[in-house]
Amino acid sequence: MIRDTKQPIKVPAKPASRSGGKAKTVKPKTVKPKAVKAADGKAASAKASTSKAAVSKTSAKAAAAKPASAKGLKGVIAMAPPSFRRERALIKRGIWPIAGCDEAGRGPLAGPVVAAAVVLDPKRVPKGLDDSKRLSAEKREALFEEICATAQVSVVYASPERINRDNILRASLWALTRAVHALPDLPRHVFVDGRDRLATQCDCEAVIGGDGLIASIAAASIIAKVSRDRLMCKLAEQCPGYGFEQHKGYGVPEHLDALARLGPTVHHRRFFAPVAAAWQKIEGAPQPQIRDLFEADVTVEATA
């Protein structure tokens, strides 16, 4: 039991001696209870620690109850869907038609680059438009059909041979420019995804990340992606064993393994290192004649 250190401890006076002398009066001494004070100090320290812990816990709960600020959400970015706002601003100024264009297939080892241009109907802008990379295959297919049914659409393919000859950037810009000029009505303004403007017969505005900002570009990205995916499935029938229907020509391990086992096809791009190495092994060997599916323009006019 811990004593109360606030009250001093009194030592009783010594009794009178038996010799008959007068008993001396001894003043009671006050003894400082060192051991008791130490024990009490530990208790006080423990109490203070418990109190601090309780305060910290309360603060943590209060912080958790507050809504997280944008500054605290590191790495979390709220992505707003593409809008038709910039197109409407141009329409108010009397500028029409307005096209968006984008491409698909710059990075794969095989297959073409596919460019698409789209002029959306302001009264029938499909809901759910977004960058094709952020959509599921099922959602892309559904939007593809809706876009083709309500908008002006053109699709152009740049073959692997053109990519090998001109490089991937020039082939992509060539396809994008042709897609714009292949539209039923030549647009007065074009939004293109990326840094590079096109040499078109109308005003062209390059927008970095445009497929996630502008509805017309988002629609074009969906048309280009679905068109290319469908074509790669056709190539898979002509070139079995490569898995084009699965990876769409990208350099995944399964594709690299097939390339090492079977060698490259005419649909592979020579300037990629794995393809170049495979070509060196079979240089001079006869190549199978495969029907060319590229360099064709496909135009789908808007329905009434």
Curated annotation (Swiss-Prot):
Q: Any idea of its EC number?
A: 3.1.26.4
Stretch list, region Disordered:
1-53
Tell me the organism: Rhodopseudomonas palustris (strain ATCC BAA-98 / CGA009)
Compositional bias annotation for Low complexity: 36-53
Q: Which cofactor does it need?
A: Mn(2+); Mg(2+)
PANTHER family to which the protein is assigned, alphabetical: RIBONUCLEASE H2 SUBUNIT A, RIBONUCLEASE HII
Role summary: Endonuclease that specifically degrades the RNA of RNA-DNA hybrids.
Q: Report the top EC class in one word.
A: hydrolase
Annotated positions binding a divalent metal cation? 102-103, 193
What is the name attached to this protein's record?
Ribonuclease HII
Family label: Belongs to the RNase HII family.
